[in-house]
Amino acid sequence: MRPDGPRDPVAGPDSGPEPPYPVRLSGPVIKGFGRGSKELGIPTANIPAEGLEEYPDLQVGVYYGVVALDPAKFQYQEGQGSTSTSSTGGAEAAVLPAVLSIGYNPFYKNKTKSIEIHIMPPLSSPSPTADGAGEVKFHKLPDFYGTQLKLLILGYIRPEYDYVSLEALIEDIRVDCEVARKSLQRPAYACYIDGDEKECSDVVREQRRWLVTF
């Protein structure tokens, strides 16, 4: 069960990701258990868990990072709060913040390990999961099954927990989203999103180049 007590507002050092992060994972978006949107109201993009074989020491739990989707199949319409699919080539992939779980989800007692990624709106947009924001509506995108997704995991938030109720699980995921947002807003992490040539190190630029190249 989740321990009682307040949550830390950020995760990871302010100076930026430390080994083993960033962790690179990629794959086509596949169908998951079908619970994210329908039961929890929290849409997720699942990718095959086989990529975890490269990282045998990566523990199960909740993480934060950044994602990009193949722009030949999916384009984020920045500034409109919506998304669309497209087959037009030449567009650059949008880099978006994400919170994700790797593991078995003890509340549902899954038998197989999964990677479930919730893609959040740009950090410049109002947070739909902020405390006191009214009714929580997690960020939703149109379906994009089969689209290639790339993920850089930048930090670890917490272990997996079981919960006394579905509502308690949803509330902890809401807090996960806020921890991820606040963590990614720090300059050493924001570079992975905005790619500022003046502020980013060569290492960050190389990681970001991998992220947006399809």
Curated annotation (Swiss-Prot):
Its EC number is 2.7.1.26. The keyword Zinc applies. Coiled coil: none annotated. Zinc or magnesium. GO terms for molecular function: ATP binding; metal ion binding; riboflavin kinase activity. Pathway: Cofactor biosynthesis; FMN biosynthesis; FMN from riboflavin (ATP route): step 1/1. Its cofactor is Zn(2+); Mg(2+). SUPFAM superfamilies: Riboflavin kinase-like. Catalyzes the phosphorylation of riboflavin (vitamin B2) to form flavin mononucleotide (FMN) coenzyme. This is Riboflavin kinase. The gene is fmn1.
